[in-house]
Amino acid sequence: MSDSNPLGALIPNREDMRCCEGDASAEISHAQLDSITDAVRHQYGALAKRAAERASSSTKASDRFYTEEQRYTLTDEAVGASAGCGNPVGIADINLGETVLDLGSGGGIDCFLAAREVGETGYVVGIDMTPEMLDLARTNAEKLQTGNIVFKLGHIESIPQEDNSVDLVISNCVIALSDKKGRVFSEIFRILKPGGRFVISDVVTD
């Protein structure tokens, strides 16, 4: 697990995620998964608050994954709220005029970088389930005077976006936290235009 991600202990192992037989076991399993989702939301909400107060900064991660030029164009709060494990924008080969959607957009760091790549004729959508992160991202957008981004409240397992409407989906160390990864990928394919693509930076394990 990348040391930039504050939620390593919250990712369930295979034993926790096993399919169970019987209603009682299934109910316990669902309760565990609900607890994980709540914990993820709580931890990222706390990270957003610390970043807004500039009491926390993921500079170690941002130094490793983002260039000095990229960091210079962002707010301190956007960098401080980053809990990613890579830089999907750096390898996505984004084109002018494209529509890009970021799953688990957090404080908006990858959205802001993507917005520069798509230009004024393009559009970026950030999806996050944490209200505090959405508030921070929208504040960052105002500070950066970025007009081609919208941030939406939603879950990556049920993306609030129209079918066949996105050229590129990106995600940075978020899908690993979902217990319904198959549904996430189905949603990605649903919203992608024909010939669309997705670029994901994430944690994997055998």
Model features per residue range: what roles?
Residues S2-R64:
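N-terminal auxiliary segments of SAM/dcSAM-dependent transferases
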Residues K60-T99, D110-L113, E117:
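Conserved alpha-helix/loop element of class I SAM-dependent methyltransferases that forms part
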Residues L96, E157-L168:
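A short acidic, Gly/Pro-enriched loop at the edge of an enzyme's catalytic core
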Residues T130-E132:
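Conserved SAM/SAH-binding beta-strand->alpha-helix loop
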Residues A137:
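Conserved SAM-binding loop
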Residues Q145-E157:
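Conserved SAM-binding strand-loop segment of SAM-dependent methyltransferases
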Residues D167-K180:
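A short SAM/SAH-binding and catalytic strip from SAM-dependent methyltransferases
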Residues G182-R197:
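A short glycine-rich, Lys/Arg-flanked "PGG" loop and its adjoining helix->strand segment in the class I
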